[in-house]
């Protein structure tokens, strides 16, 4: 049984020390697409965290009974089943957001973070540690999404969660929204800036030359 210190490290490690987007460069595609609004970024974070945590848990529970030759198929079946459940829940209780997220919830099935943790961690680790690892990686993914989402929605539309923060000129205020921040390429540059900041703060994460 893992002790509290180990569980804490597994839970918090992926947020800064081994962030799946900023340091492993995984899950970038969805980060570019769903961060124009903080609301969609938050829902995507919750969806991916739930899928990663529970897929890790279920795969870890049966890891000793999965033949090596079909392990990827088993992993994808479990992940796909969880994604379908999440998608149906979103359509039932948050239909408008589900429409905004479009295909990106379904594409969690092939998300590198989910697949990577299932194969590299859950297949070799007890259930509780695997579950916490899934939550930790989901939170790490969410930390980047929400950071980018705040900048894009605040300065691109003058609002957060749809609530006006900066009064727009068109409404008699002072702020002129920067429409470029609402385009997917802006997220690419913002994520690049976050990667630079994190690697400046943690130089040990920079790959050795030569």
Swiss-Prot record:
The family note in this entry says: Belongs to the NqrDE/RnfAE family.
Indicate what this protein is called per its UniProt record. Na(+)-translocating NADH-quinone reductase subunit D
Describe the subunit structure: Composed of six subunits; NqrA, NqrB, NqrC, NqrD, NqrE and NqrF.
Q: Name the Gene Ontology biological process terms.
A: sodium ion transport
Q: Where are the transmembrane segments?
A: 14-34, 42-62, 72-92, 96-116, 131-151, 178-198
Q: Give the bilayer topology.
A: Multi-pass membrane protein
- Listed GO cellular component terms? plasma membrane
For this protein's source organism, the top of the classification is:
Bacteria, Pseudomonadati, Pseudomonadota, Gammaproteobacteria, Alteromonadales
Chief localization class? membrane
The highest taxon in the source lineage is: Bacteria
Pfam families assigned to the protein according to its UniProt record, in alphabetical order = Rnf-Nqr (PF02508)
What is catalysed by this protein?
a ubiquinone + n Na(+)(in) + NADH + H(+) = a ubiquinol + n Na(+)(out) + NAD(+)
Keyword field: Cell inner membrane, Cell membrane, Ion transport, Membrane, NAD, Sodium, Sodium transport, Translocase, Transmembrane, Transmembrane helix, Transport, Ubiquinone
Report the locations given in the UniProt record.
Answer: Cell inner membrane
What InterPro entries does this protein's entry cite?
NqrD, NqrDE/RnfAE
> GO molecular function, one example?
oxidoreductase activity, acting on NAD(P)H, quinone or similar compound as acceptor
Q: What EC number(s) does this enzyme carry?
A: 7.2.1.1
**Chain's role:** NQR complex catalyzes the reduction of ubiquinone-1 to ubiquinol by two successive reactions, coupled with the transport of Na(+) ions from the cytoplasm to the periplasm. NqrA to NqrE are probably involved in the second step, the conversion of ubisemiquinone to ubiquinol.
